[in-house]
């Protein structure tokens, strides 16, 4: 018989928020008796943009900006009903995107 698994993927621009959210999820799952694998840090996605400083001339003078998207992945193996209820009631910060898949 195959075990049920919940895969949680977190995305955020601030690594402190994502680590705090991952710790809350792990604590909640362990309190209800589930086995947690992770959080596994996935590669940070870096988007870089070059913007002209001057609207008229000086093409060589540019600003460089970047957006870093941090990601964490964790699996909750063989969750109970209490685990699912506790995760649904969990209040996470606004800057964290949570993607949950049942496998």
Curated annotation (Swiss-Prot):
- NCBIfam families in the cross-refs: PRK00596.1, rpsJ_bact
Keyword check for Glycoprotein: no
Q: What does this protein do?
A: Involved in the binding of tRNA to the ribosomes.
Entry superkingdom: Bacteria
- Quaternary structure and partners: Part of the 30S ribosomal subunit.
Similarity comment text for this entry: Belongs to the universal ribosomal protein uS10 family.
Coiled coil (residue ranges): none
Instruction: Give the InterPro entries listed for this entry.
Output: Ribosomal_uS10, Ribosomal_uS10_CS, Ribosomal_uS10_dom, Ribosomal_uS10_dom_sf
Please give the Gene Ontology molecular function terms for this protein: structural constituent of ribosome; tRNA binding
Xref: SUPFAM superfamilies: Ribosomal protein S10
Can you cite an annotated GO cellular component?
Answer: ribonucleoprotein complex
Whether Ribosomal protein counts among this entry's keywords is yes
- GO biological process annotations for this chain's record? translation
The alphabetized UniProt keywords are: Ribonucleoprotein, Ribosomal protein
Name of protein: Small ribosomal subunit protein uS10
Q: Name one Pfam family in it.
A: Ribosomal_S10
């Amino acid at each position: 018989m195959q075990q049920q698994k919940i895969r949680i993927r977190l995305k955020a621009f601030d690594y402190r928020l994502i680590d705090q959210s991952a710790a809350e999820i792990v604590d909640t799952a362990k309190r209800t008796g589930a086995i947690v694998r992770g959080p596994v840090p996935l590669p940070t996605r870096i988007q870089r943009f070059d913007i002209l400083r001057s609207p008229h001339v000086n093409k060589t003078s540019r600003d460089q900006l970047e957006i870093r998207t941090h990601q964490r992945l964790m699996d909750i193996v063989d969750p109970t009903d209490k685990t699912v209820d506790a995760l649904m009631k969990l209040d996470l910060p606004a800057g964290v995107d949570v993607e949950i898949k049942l496998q």
